[in-house]
Amino acid sequence: MEIKYISLVDFISSKLFSLDKIKKAYLGLLSMLTDTPDITTLAFINKTYEIAKMGVVYIGYYYDVEMQEIFIVGSGTVIFEPKFIHCGKSVGHIEDIVVHERFRGAGIAKTIVDYLINLAKEKDCYKVILDCKPEIENLYGKFGFEKRGSQMAKYFL
């Protein structure tokens, strides 16, 4: 099985698979991370392009020829936040790293995170940050991240 990697926008634009199949596979993957309500295909496409204005959603996928089915096995997003400080450079925010339960431990998260880090460097970010649960801090430590400060949040949902 060969896993291929591509941005979600490029994957949609490639027209290799139906938009409905891509939406189903992607939202199915995200549901392994958090609540992911079903949305229309049009809403999915619009949200994909909205996110692309601020960053990149990067996915790993493979196509099962026997089943005639697409599997999106991993995903991560980097959002670029412009700053006045640090000579006007941006911060890269890595978000929504998720690997399909059946494919964890195969290096997919590392491939995705490495790509997002390199993209942040190419975009001249002065740093890249991510939030994670304490139980997976060691994983991101292996990718070169250091624990700095603490994250706080106020949820509206």
Which residue stretches match the model-derived regions?
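Conserved GNAT acetyl-CoA-binding A-motif
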Residues: 113, 120-132, 146
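Conserved beta-strand in the GNAT
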Residues: 59, 69-80, 98
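A short helix-loop-beta-strand connector motif used in the catalytic cores of GNAT acetyltransferases and
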Residues: 48-63, 93, 151
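Conserved catalytic-core motifs of GNAT/GCN5-like acyltransferases
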Residues: 80-83, 129-137, 141, 146-157
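Conserved acetyl-CoA-binding loop-helix of GNAT-fold acetyltransferases
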Residues: 99, 105-118
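Short amphipathic alpha-helix that is part of the acyltransferase structural core
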Residues: 1-43
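A conserved beta-turn-beta hairpin within the catalytic core of GNAT-like acetyltransferases
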Residues: 71, 82-94, 104
